[in-house]
UniProtKB/Swiss-Prot annotation:
Keyword DNA repair: yes
Keyword flag Cytoplasm: yes
Full protein name: UvrABC system protein C
Gene this protein is translated from: uvrC
Principal cellular location given in the protein's record: cytoplasm
GO biological process, one term: SOS response
Keywords from the UniProt entry: Cytoplasm, DNA damage, DNA excision, DNA repair, Excision nuclease, SOS response
Disordered as annotated region, ranges: 650-681
Role noted for this protein: The UvrABC repair system catalyzes the recognition and processing of DNA lesions. UvrC both incises the 5' and 3' sides of the lesion. The N-terminal half is responsible for the 3' incision and the C-terminal half is responsible for the 5' incision.
Compartment list: Cytoplasm
Length: 681
């Protein structure tokens, strides 16, 4: 650990101005970012007697090896720069709110030609309207099912939409009146967009307009003795009112507001947020954070505001934000929120009435969330600590393996050979660190050779990052190598304490040999064989057998199974893309537009394959020479292998070229977040 006096700035060096500062460790990584109204006063507080510092602040300043700062002109600029640096560098000692879960939103993709209503999680996309968050996805689906009677907006995926447009037949929702079926041109793109905008208006809280309009239409229909139409409108009104009843009125003035409450103890804090729109609670979410330094409730509120609104603009930032304590000073934060919204935002503490009552409800939720988290964490932490200790004891390690990486190879009879790397830190999944590999050095089936290649590539990258971050002495750097002074976390910068491979002695030996060839001797290696669940170590003829009730064995099984799942998912994706390749892809000069025209004309690749040259010439834009080239391409191609849904075993029909299960136009299901994070190497 460093002595803070060794890098303390000289007297007079630190300006007495607003600014943002960064602490870096000995490897030049940014470990803490903060802002201050006066840099001189704030930084001086870190270099006082260590005994007087908060324990976690003391750990931070002794871990750091240098400090630097950037002067800004206003406190609002300091707030913006602090947020952007925290997002960029991900400093380990900054307050980080951990979502209790990935909350689902009701999303309307207004950025598409035919907007779609769907459930979405994760990062927000530009051009998409979001409503929520909701506690459960089923709550969104119940609401949408009711509203589709009145606002029959498209809900199908891009693949289903294209297939319906190609065949001229809508999906089931189009037949039962819960979709306006723009895919078969029952309504125009403009009419469908108007429906989507009305859907968004209703979800935004402007409900009275539509209820009154439908009531007038129902009355007019009844007066004209159009009783079936009147009955249908009556049912539509009932559906809208039922959807509204799901969110009781909590604020009589029908305001838009977010209420933030904080419950805390010496080590942790829980934040709860209620999103109120049109006087009704439209969503709720909660976070928990470790208090890495001596922070006040006002500081926690400020961090929560940054987390909530750092990426939001316009109406996503409400007119009113109610908090238990105001940031000090409050003016820069309020000015920043106003800038995000584009109009004045009121940031205040509720004093009386229904807003104070609702704030008390939010506060109770925060207290219950903190109590539940501490109970669960105490149990989980004890179990995880015992599992890591058992692994360390069984493998004769010097300390518990806080970072474990597991590798698995997946292929189908030697085709589409891929590998996965999954990471567990402190016994928990670290999905942002997952990686995927394609085996490049050879073709065919050889798990041992594949394992050697993957381990070599991963740890060669680690050694490269080690050089770039300056972790080796300057004299060890190669000519022309530049040290990376940005301090951002790198993809392969952190080594594990334990490498686990899915397999027995051959795979373990291959992994160990790869590390030895790179000169790495401080990383333990083991393998977990299937069926008997035996743990294999390098150079040991007999496996280590852990008790079946061992928490350590259970953790190793979880790690191994996760690596297997991640690898086989990637392998299936690659296989599906290969199966869906078309001979049309090899026809020179045949662009996407004419491919689509061919598929639309014949209905499928299978029918196109059996067509004559004269029949192909009937397609607009296809001349005889091109038709002959297409016929030759199909004649030379091997018989098409049918694509199979690996989950159900169902043989899938031909689709138009370029459409795959992983198309960027398809929404990714909530259960595959780690596949989205994984990066192909």
């Amino acid at each position: 650990m460093a002595d803070p006096s060794s890098y303390r700035p000289k007297p007079g060096e630190i300006p007495d101005s607003p600014g943002v500062y960064k602490f870096r460790d000995e490897h030049h990584r940014v470990i803490y970012v903060g802002k201050a109204k006066s840099l001189r006063q704030r930084l001086a507080s870190y270099f006082q007697d260590l005994a007087g510092l908060h324990p976690r602040t003391r750990t931070m300043v002794t871990t750091a090896a240098s400090v630097e700062w950037t002067v800004v002109s206003t406190e609002v600029e300091a707030l913006q720069l602090e947020y952007s640096w925290i997002k960029e560098y991900d400093p380990r000692f900054n307050v980080k709110y951990r979502d209790d879960k990935s909350y689902p939103y009701l999303a309307v993709t207004m950025n598409e030609e035919f907007p779609r209503v769907q459930v979405m999680r994760g990062h927000k996309r530009k051009g998409v309207r979001y409503f929520g968050p909701y506690g459960h996805a089923w709550a969104i689906r119940d609401t949408v099912d009711l509203l589709l009677r009145v606002f029959p907006v498209r809900t199908c995926s891009a693949g289903v939409f294209k297939n319906a447009a190609r065949t001229g037949r809508p999906c089931l929702l189009g037949y039962i009146g819960k979709c306006s079926a723009p895919c078969v041109e029952r309504v125009s793109a403009e009419e469908h967009r108007e429906l989507a905008e009305e859907f968004c208006d209703f979800m935004a809280g402007r409900t009275g307009t539509y209820i009154r309009r439908l009531e007038r239409q129902m009355t007019d229909a009844a007066e004209e003795m159009e009783y079936e139409k009147a009955a249908r409108l009556r049912d539509d009104i009932g559906a809208l009112k039922k959807a509204m009843e799901k969110n009781a009125v909590v604020l009589a003035d029908a305001t838009d507001a977010d209420l933030i409450a904080v419950a805390e103890d010496e080590l942790e804090a829980a934040v709860q947020i209620f999103h109120v729109r049109g006087g009704r609670v439209r969503g709720q979410r909660g976070w928990v954070t470790d208090k890495v330094e001596a922070v006040t409730t006002a500081d926690l509120v400020e961090h929560a505001l940054q987390q909530l609104y750092g990426e939001e603009t316009g109406d996503s930032v409400p007119k009113e934000v109610l908090v238990p304590a105001l940031p000090d000073p409050v003016e820069p934060v309020q000015e920043w929120l106003t800038g995000r919204r584009g109009s004045i935002v009121s940031l205040r503490i509720p004093q009386r009435g229904d807003k104070k009552s609702l704030m008390e409800t939010v506060q109770r939720n925060a207290q219950q969330s903190l109590a539940l988290h501490k109970t669960k964490r105490a149990s989980d932490l004890t179990t995880r600590s015992r599992a890591l200790e058992e692994i360390a004891e069984a493998l004769d390690l010097d300390s518990a393996p806080l970072r474990i990486e597991c590798y698995d190879i997946s292929h189908l009879q030697g085709d589409d050979v891929v590998a996965s790397m999954v990471v567990f830190e402190d016994g928990l999944q670290r999905k942002s660190e997952y990686r995927r590999f394609q085996i490049k050095s050879f073709e065919g089936q050889d798990d041992v050779r594949s394992m050697h290649e993957v381990i070599t590539r991963r740890f060669r990258r680690y050694l490269s990052e080690k050089e770039r971050t300056g972790e080796w002495a300057d004299g060890d750097l190669k000519d022309g190598e530049l040290k990376d002074d940005e301090g951002r976390p790198k993809r392969f910068a952190y080594p594990p304490q334990l490498v686990v491979v899915d397999g027995g002695q051959p795979q373990v030996a291959a992994a160990k040999r790869a590390l030895d060839e790179l000169g790495i001797d401080d990383i333990a290696v083991c393998g977990l064989a299937k069926r008997l669940e035996e743990v294999w170590l390098p150079d040991d003829g007999d496996p280590v057998v852990l008790p079946r009730t061992s928490e350590g064995l259970y953790l190793l099984q979880r790690v191994r199974d996760e690596a297997h799942r991640f690898a086989i998912t990637y392998q299936r994706t690659k296989r599906a893309k290969r199966f869906r390749a078309s001979p049309l892809d090899d026809v020179a000069g045949l662009g996407e537009t004419r491919k689509q025209a061919l598929i639309k004309h014949f209905g499928s690749v299978k029918k196109l394959r059996s067509a004559t040259i004269d029949q192909i010439c009937e397609v607009p834009g296809i001349g005889r020479k091109t038709a002959e080239t297409i016929a030759v391409a199909f004649a030379q191609a091997a018989p098409a292998v049918p694509a199979v849904n690996t989950a159900t075993g169902e043989i899938m029909e031909d689709e138009e070229p370029g459409t795959t299960a992983g198309s960027s136009q398809e929404p990714v299901s909530a259960g595959t977040s780690d596949e989205r994070r994984g990066q192909e190497t």
